[in-house]
Every structure is written in C-alpha cells, then in structure tokens.
Amino acid sequence: MAAAEQKKSYKVVKQFKGLNTKANRTAIEEDEFSWIENVQPIGYGNARVTPSYITSKDTGGNAVVWASTVSHLTSCNIDITDYVIAFQTNGSAQYYNIVTKATGNVAVAGTFSNAGVITSQWKNERMLILDPAKGYFTWDGNNVVSVGSVGIIAVTNTGSGYTGAPTVVIGAPIDSHGTQANATASVLSGAVALVSLDDAGSGYGVPPPSITISGGGGSGATAIAGVVTFATGTASAVVVSGGTGYTNSANTVVTFSGGGGSNAAGTAVLGGGQVKQVIMTNPGSGYTNAANLVVTVSGGGGTGAVLKGIVNSDVNCGIASFSGRVFIAAGRTIFYSAADSYTDFTSVSAGSFVLTDSTLHGNIQQILAANNFLYIFGDDSINVFSDVRVDTNGITLFTNTNVSASVGSKRANAIFPYFRSVLFLNDYGIYALVGSTTSKISDSLDGMFPNIDFSYPIYAGQVLLNNILCAAFNFRYFDSVFTNSYRYVQAVFFEKKWFITSQGDALQYVTSVPVSGLVTLFGTSGNSLYQLYGNASASITSRVQTALLPMSDPIRTKQALKIGIEATASNISSITMQATVDSENQQSPPYTLSSLVSWINNSLQVVVWKNNSNATIGWGQIGYNLYKTDASMYGKYVGITVTSSNPGYVYNGFEFEHELRVRF
C-alpha cells in the first residue's frame, strides 16, 4: 500500500458560481473564480465564452464612424424605429437607424453643450433632450426643436364691453418646426380677466410671441407672454413691493444691471396702482451672480416698487417622462409639465417642487421613471414620487417618500431599471433598489473598486447574453494582474453572479437598444460604433482563474501532478489554451493545451498537412474534449489560470491530480 503522502488525490470543479474579488484567492469558495473574463458562468459545468463585438455598418456596408468625439451615447424609439444617438463634443448629434442602417444628423455643431446632455422618451413620438445649460429640446426623427414654450400670459389691459369670450391668437413660433401655442380668454364683468394656455407649443424664443385678443363684443384688451426654455444663466424678477401710483404701463420701464450677464429685459404688469409682476421679454444670458443683479422700475407715474433679481444658475441634471408628464430636475427643484403635455410648464396642473429634505445633500443628480415610481437620486439619498393625481381645482398632487437616507449615486449614466428593481453604481459599490429596500449586490467586486478610474464616464445598461437578461456596467479599470494598464471592462451581473467582459480597451460609452425584440448593447470606441457581443465567431481573449484550492486539507503541502480542463466546442474544430498551475506563492510556466490531432507516419514522424494555399492546417474535433497535461507545482493551495483566444466554446470542468505532502 502506498504511503499516505504518495497517495494520488483528485479534485474536480464543475459548479461555477462566478467572480469573487472580495477575499484572497485562497479564501474564496472552491467553485468561485478570482477572475473570469469573457466567460459567462451560466451553471453547473457550463461556463460559456462570450461573443466579441462587431462593427456597425451603414447602408453602404461601411463602418459607422461619428463625425466628432462622442460625449454621450443614448438610444430612442420613434414610431417603430430604434436609433442609437451620439452627442458630440462640438455640440452636434448624429443618429444610427437600427432598422435601415442609415446614419444622419440630429443637430449641427453648436446646438448643444459639449458635455452633460441627457435624454428621455415621450411616448414613441420623440426624444426629449435636456442640455445642462442650453435648456430643453425634442427630436421627432426629423427635426430638433427647442422647447421654448409659451409661459405665463399676463393681461396688461382688461378692455371693456365683452359679452362673450374673445378669441386669443398667439404668434407663430420662431422655429419653423415648432408647434403652435393656443390660449383661451375668460371674461368677468365685461372685461378680460384671464388668458389661459390650452397648448404651450414649442419652438418659441426671443422675442416672445405676440398676443392678439379680438371679438367677444368688446375692445381694448391686451396681453403679453413670456417663454419657458430651462436655459441657465438667465435672469428674471419678482415683486418684493408693488409700490403706489403706477397707472401708465406704456412708460413703466424695468431695468436689469449687474449679475455678470447681459440683455435681460422685462415688462411690468400693473394693477390697482401697483406693479403686480414682471414678464420677461428677454431672459438674457451669461448671468451668474444674483447678489449683484439689480432690477429697478422707473416711470409709470408711481413710486416705491421694489423688485428682486433672480438668476437661473442651477444646472439641468435630469429628465424623465412619468405619469403622462415630463419631469425636469435642476438643482434641488423638480419641474413638471401639465398632464398629457411635454411642453406646458405653466398651466394650473404644471408646477415645481423643491426638495427640502435634509437627506438630500447638495443637489439632485439624476431622475428615473420605472416600476410606477419616479426615482430622485442624490449623491447619498433616494426619494420616490408616486400616486400622481389632479385634485378638483386642477392642481397636481403626488406623494414624496425618502427610501434611502444614506445611499445614492452621482453616476447618472449608471442608473437603470433591471426587472422590478433599479440598479445603480456609486463610488463604493453597486446596489439594487427593490421597492423601498436598497441592498448592495457587488460584494464580489470589492477588490476591483479601488482600481476603477472614476474620473472617466461610467455607463451601464441591460443586455441579453445566452438568452439571459444581464446588467452590464462599463468602466475604466487598472488591470494590475494581466495587462498592467488601464482598459475598459464590463462588470456583468445575472442571477446573483458576476463576471467580466472586455469588448474593446477604449470602449467609453454604451447604451441598450432592443433589436428585433432582443435587448442589445451598443458602444463607441474612439468614434466608431460597435454592437457588443454580436460576433460569435471572432477571436476573443478569455481568462479564467480558479480559486486556489486547499484540496480539503489546507495544512498539508500538495504536489500537483496533472491538470485537466473539460471543454466543449460546438462550432470550431480546435481549441488552444495556455494554462498555468498556480500556488499561493508562485506560478508555473504556461502549458499549451490543444485539441489538434497529430498525424504520425511509420517512421514516427509528424505529418504536416497543407491546403491549396500551401498553409498548414490542423485536425481537430467538434464536441467534448479533455485538455490535460502533466503539471509541476507545489503549495498549500493549488489552482489554474487559463487563457485562450478561441471563440464559441464552453468550459465544463477543471480537474486536478495531486499528492499530499508534509504538514506545515
């Protein structure tokens, strides 16, 4: 009988759980991996190499290359067509039509800011675009329109003699692709008391539209309108004291000075001898300092009116369509449109809400509509709006609930719905928000987070891999083990398991798009557009590093004798792997494992086969193979690191033959 220390022992690993970087390689579970890249650990004996990326082609079969440097990648749906949209650093935007493969311009250079643009969707009619500084726009598949919508309409002269409601005509929008605004007048005691918006329109700007009131049996009624744009750096004024004796609106002058900007202008609306409000005829631009913005009133026959200047300096940071409205976040304020409108932010059912919660530190970072909630993300908090309704007076009501007072995210493009949860990444983990419960799901990635470069954008989205809906987070990562360099990788999550993919070392932006009903991930590397995981036959570098196994006895030294790797190839005839045998202190030279069959002649010489092009060909077999080799390694713990560039195969198991040696 062999001595105990010379008895051969065996270990087989087939239950694949996924990546675990939280603990040392010697301390993770035996069926976990200390690194698993471009291999999806689907289940027992089934770890499948993921497809590589494929270049997106236009109608002429040419690679899709954006005209300028990409600053944001997103997608939208117009009618039944899905688009990938690239916003660029020169302020332009371009589209790629997923159905027809056509490319084209969404907007010319200078339309948008060079960074910070975010988007949402209104029905399947148009993409909603929020620029951090230039305001709110829409794109309907043909034209970008600035949602300068008609704002407050103030009656400057009530007129007299009206026996019925007069007709109100609002001037045409400045943008020829805008939509016409409409309003209705209300009469009280023979005078026009109120002009109410029916449709706020779009494409309005400076100067604001004219308001014409006619008919109704009376005369003399006049009104003026302002415009809502959500542009920052603009100025407005509120009345602190209305003063007395103001009777002549024609020569009442409102003057803006200071504040760092220019061109702000407004018209005073009088009533009862007082200044009642100021309608901005030009909000100006470049205003930054409300403290030294001075607004004065002169003329009009009165005295004592005091106005306060307001500067809109809050950066636009979130947009979402929810409950039949558009919600826009800026600073700590949420603006919401009227019911069933994407442009009307003035009517009675529209409004704004300032988050005064102490749990919101700083400003809102992002908003997201999903699962019948509107999620309001702060850097370290999450609120939800729900139960949106309109009361009998037409006022919009909703419930505001804080669901997380300690965890949030400022990574606006790494927040997205996944099944019935919302997943989000922050600087110390990845979390799932299910209902009102936030839980960390990235414990297995704790060893990676110190090496993530948070100075670069982080994007995320859903993707279907091997008929499994996965969540993928794309970030720039310093790989200190395999490449000793920064590269972009994707941390992919499904069924409580993580693995890593690499779909291009310079893949900076990604976005999810449904293609023929399948959730697909597109990305940009440089200025080129790619469909990720779209090429199952292209070479792709896969890396699998098992746990360092104690072989049931961590005290005794193990002498590795052989290793084996079970793999199945369904569409390629051969697989070549480079494998090392590892211990807690060292790593063997690489062993080449291959399924190629060598032909030997009667003289025991290898027969080399050539094709018609005089290229050497190999003989292999499709299906299951056991790739095995003698091994030389010793240590308290033993594991395998295997790399390959072959696509389309499945790891079925990892096998070890070893002998137990001395204790301690």
Residue ranges and their predicted role:
Residues 96, 171-173, 214, 335-347, ...:
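Predominantly extracellular/luminal cell-surface or secreted proteins
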Residues 148-312:
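Conserved, function-critical positions that sit in or immediately flank catalytic
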Residues 161-162, 203-204, 246, 286-287, ...:
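Aromatic/pi-system hotspot detector in well-structured domains
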Residues 90, 133-134, 139-142, 330, ...:
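Acidic/polar residues in short coil/turn loops that connect beta-strands
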Residues 118-148:
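Hydrophobic or amphipathic alpha-helical targeting/insertion segments
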Residues 2-106, 110-128, 406-410, 417-421, ...:
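Beta-sheet repeat architectures centered on beta-propellers
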Residues 60-72, 104-114, 148, 312-463:
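Beta-propeller and closely related beta-pinwheel folds
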Residues 142-156, 188-191, 583-597:
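Internal, charge-rich low-complexity segments
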